[in-house]
Amino acid sequence: MLLKKSKLIGNQTIEISGSKSISNRLLILHQLFNNIEIKNLSNSQDTQLLEKALNSNSETIDIHHAGTAMRFLTSYFSIQEGKTVVLTGSERMKQRTIKFLVDALRALGAKISYLEKEGYPPLKITGKKLEKNTVTISANISSQFISSLMLIGAKLENGLEIILEGKVTSKPYLEMTLKILRTVGIANHWEGNTIKIEPIDSNNHVEKHLQNIPFIVESDWSSASYFYSLAAISRETVNLKSFKPYSLQGDSALREIYWDFFGVNTISEGAEAKISLLPEHYFNFPEKIVLNMNDCPDI
């Protein structure tokens, strides 16, 4: 294989698909409240599979390799009263544990059974009203298990209190979920090791608040990392559309990373939600880089 350095045409503008993490959370909320208009939805396969599953009337839902869809749909279908589904996936998906989430949902009163190996998909889920509103779950597991519970919390009669045990991993993803819930009008609090999602009641007209309000999904920062690398290597300016200066995504940390270690400055143009990646032409690159990527593993 022969690799040659290419000449990048500078100052081009590129539009990246919406954030998968934000899109998947909004799809669940849209299905729960029926009146969220989502723009710039992610075109990722995971998001497409989740959207297809939410709109399906089939008794068997196959989400293939989409791990986020498996986790979010497990909680979603557990509160769909009177509906029974089998939630399955690829052979690889059947090797990925979902026990922590199922245990938490069962503790709330959900009716979920394993159809093959204990602790793993496929699942048989019979939707019902969940009577309990407090659950304890390990904090050092995938944040998607916890976010999955948070997304349905406001639909429970008394809301949901989640007690986290241990050190939290991927904290930015939990904060993202909480911020999205607040944006749609669902009150929540995170104090110490306890997350509280307030219920929807007669004084909290979330559906009315959301009516005809469009959500423009900011573009995906982890995907932007490739273009930051192009700017860093070529030392040419690259422009990216639909990125907000105050991002919900933990992966937006790449702005500081590429400035500190590669001399690529990020300039925001708020009116157009556009950012320009401007490389410093006389930058002294460090001999080595040491970074803690715990809060932004996708980059």
Description of each model-found segment:
Residues M1-I299:
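Short, structured segments at the rim of ligand-binding sites
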